[in-house]
Amino acid sequence: MGNRAEEDYNFVFKVVLIGESGVGKTNLLSRFTRNEFSHDSRTTIGVEFSTRTVMLGTAAIKAQIWDTAGLERYRAITSAYYRGAVGALLVFDLTKHQTYAVVERWLKELYDHAEATIVVMLVGNKSDLSQSREVPTEEARMFAENNGLLFLETSALDSTNVELAFETVLKEIFAKVSKQRQNNARTNAVTLGSGPAGQELGPGEKRACCISL
């Protein structure tokens, strides 16, 4: 359990990490949620998630970050992993081109199981190993642009762009949710007493629903 401040939030956003084994998904998760990095390359089997609450304007957003934790090795990721996700970081290792070559397959699997409105960022991890780079920045950037994805290069080791990557995705999700709520208000779609999932909480309320975009 986090401290009281950690428990006070307006929205919960589920964000999934996907990509090949060994690209640094778990370290991106631990760097963002706990500011930790592990040099131990052993893979833990089983789905896990961590949370961190961030402020976007006056709204407290609880980011629930899910990690496949090795299941991708066995093609054992199920639809339950993607269910309810409103954001995804599709991670590849920019020092191993083979992890980038299968990005399109991961994107297809994501769209097969997740909502079409999910916010997706392509992440080239391990930017600290620039001398070993196998994937040009512009190649990955163009792929992202052509597929409507956000794009950043990160280093979980030295923290470069890790905060920015997660916060950019969360801001994009929040913008979509805010726009959806405005549209609902315009069309009188919100019924008193039975607001939609992910409804913003009033003063003093601390519980929240997961968002569906």
UniProtKB/Swiss-Prot annotation:
MF (Gene Ontology): G protein activity; GTP binding; GTPase activity; myosin V binding
Location of the motif Switch 2: 67-84
Disulfide cysteine pairs (residue numbers): none
Name of the protein in question: Ras-related protein Rab-25
Residues linked to a lipid group, S-geranylgeranyl cysteine type: 209-210
Highest classification ranks of the organism: Eukaryota, Metazoa, Chordata, Craniata, Vertebrata
Organism: Bos taurus
Broad EC category: hydrolase
Catalytically driven reaction(s): GTP + H2O = GDP + phosphate + H(+)
